[in-house]
């Protein structure tokens, strides 16, 4: 069958119309865009602690730990005096002293062993002045080593207050002076423990004085006392701790 020119034009127009209609009926693809990157969130600063800030004065502060020999061969060892002259940190003291907070940091590498001038103030029967250099150096090496304080891994001992309550004596807490019992979170050699420490404080002329004297077991801090010769020579678990801290209000400091 022959198709004339008019029919050919009609057929071509129909095909073109069908093509246009089919393209209109297809859903249009909306180009997808990647979601915008999340805005970087800066870490929030720690909340301000209430009270007037006092900074520890290292040159006027001192921590002393008395460690005692034990075991069947105790007479072959020495009692040792460990000290820090490098205490750092701060106290924040509001009008209500019991709401005070503090943080004390002790750089482990600065701990000394058996300073003659400090031993001279102790009972000479328990702490004679003549400790051999080898014994002093060996004790410090063992103390800073991985089996005890692990100074290379954990360079600081950190003490943070958790709560403060009056000591169990009448009139223990005053605005200028008093005695309290502080519950402290201690971090020693990476181990976190909670201990209670009696503190006597005095506030005068922009200066805070805090002192204490107490027995404390190494195991309370998560430490294992040093032992040698299969336990024949040991360091006793119980130590004696004394501290005297001076902190002062910095220039321009104001209650927060």
Language model features with spans:
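Bacterial N-terminal signal peptides that target proteins for export
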Residues: 2-13
């Amino acid at each position: 069958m022959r198709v004339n020119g008019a029919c050919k034009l009609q057929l071509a127009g129909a095909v073109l119309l069908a093509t246009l209609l089919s393209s209109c009926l297809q859903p249009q693809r909306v180009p997808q865009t990647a979601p915008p990157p999340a805005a970087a969130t800066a870490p929030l600063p720690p909340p301000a602690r209430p009270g007037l800030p006092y900074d520890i004065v290292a040159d006027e502060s001192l921590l002393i730990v008395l460690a005692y020999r034990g075991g069947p061969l105790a007479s072959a060892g020495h009692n040792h005096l460990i000290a820090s002259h490098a205490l750092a940190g701060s106290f924040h003291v509001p009008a209500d002293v019991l709401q005070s907070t503090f943080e004390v940091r002790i750089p482990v590498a600065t701990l000394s062993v058996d300073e003659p001038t400090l031993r001279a103030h102790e009972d000479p029967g328990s702490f004679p002045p003549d400790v051999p250099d080898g014994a002093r150096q060996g004790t410090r090496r063992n103390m800073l080593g991985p089996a005890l304080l692990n100074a290379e891994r954990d360079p600081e001992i950190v003490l943070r207050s958790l709560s403060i309550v009056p000591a169990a004596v009448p009139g223990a807490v005053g605005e200028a002076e008093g005695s309290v019992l502080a519950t402290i979170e201690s971090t020693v050699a990476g181990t976190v423990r909670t201990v209670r420490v009696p503190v006597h404080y005095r506030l005068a002329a922009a200066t805070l004085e805090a002192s204490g004297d107490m027995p404390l077991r190494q195991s309370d801090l998560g430490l294992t006392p040093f032992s040698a010769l299969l336990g024949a020579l040991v360091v006793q678990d119980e130590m004696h701790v004394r501290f005297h801290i001076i902190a002062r209000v910095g220039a321009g400091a104001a209650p927060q």
